[in-house]
């Protein structure tokens, strides 16, 4: 039986096995899907071992996305823009193909599942790390009016804006540089939720129709989404749908079939 996996450290929390099991039943495909906890300094060896044992593909989670990108022989445009891989495909010719579907998953969840329009909208992204870099390309493809990246270290936000400046209107800066305006979409992409915190955002960023979205899901997303509700945001979503949509795109890469994500999202929401 073909073998697939999610590789990370930690990996115990991953919902990907549950999601792929649901896709497996829905599409009548049979395969094994494993959780592989790779040593922090042993990612390449873990991938080789899995590949040598017949592995066909792997989802990649923290902290290995950049290393997975470097390990690949060929890469998608999104992976090249992100300098990170969210999934690998082990091809018949022995090569490794890297993709990054994080941004695709986000845009699909916002536009298809939540009916949020991104075209000609103002988008504020909080955080300038790897998570932000992974979503910028697909967000810019949606042709927003502008994207503003804000970060505790302004130079990181400026650097990301410079990398993508030819793709659309994009700015970067620190929290004290945020111009007083109401954004259509605010995306939280920092790891502060793991500590039960959220960034020092000022009041006045949220309008009556604003959408706030945390790339994390469950309890980790709660601090930011609670702030958004307190500020009067009409639409507040965590990143559970993004994860499912990401995995649906990976499933299509591996099997050539696009699964129905709605029942899987509903199933996970009922159990989380």
From Swiss-Prot:
It holds the Pfam family Shikimate_dh_N. GO terms for molecular function: NADP binding; shikimate 3-dehydrogenase (NADP+) activity. The active site is at 65 (proton acceptor). InterPro entries: Aminoacid_DH-like_N_sf (IPR046346), NAD(P)-bd_dom_sf (IPR036291), Shikimate_DH (IPR011342), Shikimate_DH-bd_N (IPR013708), Shikimate_DH_fam (IPR022893), Shikm_DH/Glu-tRNA_Rdtase (IPR006151). NADP(+) binds at residues 127-131, 151-156, 215, 239. Shikimate binds at residues 14-16, 61, 102, 217. Keywords: Amino-acid biosynthesis, Aromatic amino acid biosynthesis, NADP, Oxidoreductase. Its EC number is 1.1.1.25. The keyword Transmembrane does not apply. It is an enzyme of class 1 (oxidoreductase). GO terms for cellular component: cytosol. Gene3D superfamilies: Leucine Dehydrogenase, chain A, domain 1, NAD(P)-binding Rossmann-like Domain. It comes from the Bacteria. GO terms for biological process: amino acid biosynthetic process; aromatic amino acid family biosynthetic process; chorismate biosynthetic process; shikimate metabolic process. Signal peptide: none annotated. Pathway: Metabolic intermediate biosynthesis; chorismate biosynthesis; chorismate from D-erythrose 4-phosphate and phosphoenolpyruvate: step 4/7. It catalyses: shikimate + NADP(+) = 3-dehydroshikimate + NADPH + H(+). Homodimer. Belongs to the shikimate dehydrogenase family. HAMAP family: Shikimate_DH_AroE. Involved in the biosynthesis of the chorismate, which leads to the biosynthesis of aromatic amino acids. Catalyzes the reversible NADPH linked reduction of 3-dehydroshikimate (DHSA) to yield shikimate (SA). This is Shikimate dehydrogenase (NADP(+)). It comes from Coxiella burnetii (strain Dugway 5J108-111).
């Amino acid at each position: 039986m073909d073998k697939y996996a999610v590789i990370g450290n930690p990996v115990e929390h991953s919902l990907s096995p549950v999601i792929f099991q649901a896709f497996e039943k829905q599409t009548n495909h049979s395969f094994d899907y494993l959780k592989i906890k790779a040593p922090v300094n042993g990612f390449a060896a873990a991938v080789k071992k899995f590949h040598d044992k017949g592995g066909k593909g792997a989802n990649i989670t923290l902290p290995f996305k950049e290393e997975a990108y470097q390990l690949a022989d060929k890469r998608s445009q999104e992976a090249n823009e992100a300098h990170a891989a969210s999934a690998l495909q082990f091809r018949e010719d022995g090569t490794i193909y890297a993709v990054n579907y994080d941004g695709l998953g986000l845009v699909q969840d916002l536009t298809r599942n939540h009916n949020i329009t991104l075209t000609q909208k103002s988008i504020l992204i909080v955080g300038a790390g790897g998570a932000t870099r992974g979503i910028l390309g697909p967000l810019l493809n949606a042709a927003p009016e502008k994207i503003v990246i804000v970060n505790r270290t302004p130079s990181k936000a400026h650097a990301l804006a410079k990398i993508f400046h030819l793709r659309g209107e994009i700015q970067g800066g620190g929290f004290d540089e945020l111009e007083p305006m109401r954004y259509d979409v605010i995306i939280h992409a920092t790891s502060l939720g793991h500590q039960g915190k959220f960034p020092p955002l000022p009041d006045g960023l949220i309008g009556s129709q604003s959408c706030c979205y945390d790339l994390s899901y469950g309890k980790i997303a709660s601090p930011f989404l609670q702030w958004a509700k307190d500020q009067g945001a009409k639409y507040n979503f965590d990143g559970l749908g993004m994860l499912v949509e990401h995995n649906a795109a990976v499933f299509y890469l591996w099997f050539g079939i696009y699964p129905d994500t709605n029942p899987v999202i509903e199933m996970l929401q009922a159990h989380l």
